[in-house]
Amino acid sequence: EIVLTQSPAITAASLGQKVTITCSASSSVSYMHWYQQKSGTSPKPWIYEISKLASGVPARFSGSGSGTSYSLTISSMEAEDAAIYYCQQWNYPLWTFGGGTKLEIKR
């Protein structure tokens, strides 16, 4: 089983600040996906196949990486971006998820 470790576990960013969330895999993976979850809702697909934005995701989000190291970046934090973000990969026959990164607004 491939283990995904996200960093940081919790972070706070000011509006307009650049934010980067990283996901490290215990073995090389071909594709990494990202989900956004807001309080009381199910996780939504956010970025798929490393860098492709899901429908409706703002262009300030981007994804990158290869091998065992991947990241999600927000170029300029907005209030609506406060959420929990999860990385996820599939390695037959298992889906595995990272533990999540809680992104809050710094006030």
Curated annotation (Swiss-Prot):
What are the cysteine partners in each disulfide bond? 23-87
Q: Which SUPFAM superfamilies match?
A: Immunoglobulin
Q: Where is this region: Framework-4?
A: 97-106
GO annotation (BP), single: immune response
Q: Where is this region: Framework-3?
A: 56-87
Look up keyword Disulfide bond and say if it applies: yes
Q: What is this protein called?
A: Ig kappa chain V-VI region XRPC 44
Extra notes? This chain was isolated from a myeloma protein that bind galactan.
Record-linked PROSITE patterns = IG_LIKE (PS50835)
Which residues lie within the region annotated Complementarity-determining-1? 24-33
Q: Which domain of life is it from?
A: Eukaryota
Signal sequence range = none
Q: Where is this region: Framework-1?
A: 1-23
| Pfam families linked to this entry | V-set
User: Per the record, which residues fall in region Framework-2?
Assistant: 34-48
Q: Which UniProt keywords apply?
A: Adaptive immunity, Disulfide bond, Immunity, Immunoglobulin
> Does this UniProt record's set of keywords contain Disulfide bond?
yes
